[in-house]
Amino acid sequence: MVYVFDIDDTICIRDNKNDLTYLSAYPIPERIEKINQLYDEGHTIYFLTARGMGRSNNKNPENLRGTTEQQLFEWGVKYHELFMGKPAADYYIDDKGISDKDFFN
């Protein structure tokens, strides 16, 4: 199976939403553990993030790629590919969507 995960407020917490560097984000270990288990079972893991798309007016999501990749590495996240540039939105409606709370509980 292929899984696509968001990053912020899904596998990490950002208490300071005004921190556009995302350096204040910290991991949610039990969620990362579940993702790593899926990876180890042979599933494909993608991350799709809106970092750099919202408050920065959709200017340069790629500017945050290095920071994001470093965080995923430091947090021990196993994945196949990181996609930057997810459009910022209040809601995402998808026929295959599931809330993070439902998935991780």
Located regions from the model:
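Catalytic phosphate/metal-binding cores of nucleic-acid and nucleotide-processing enzymes, i.e., regions
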Residues: 1-105
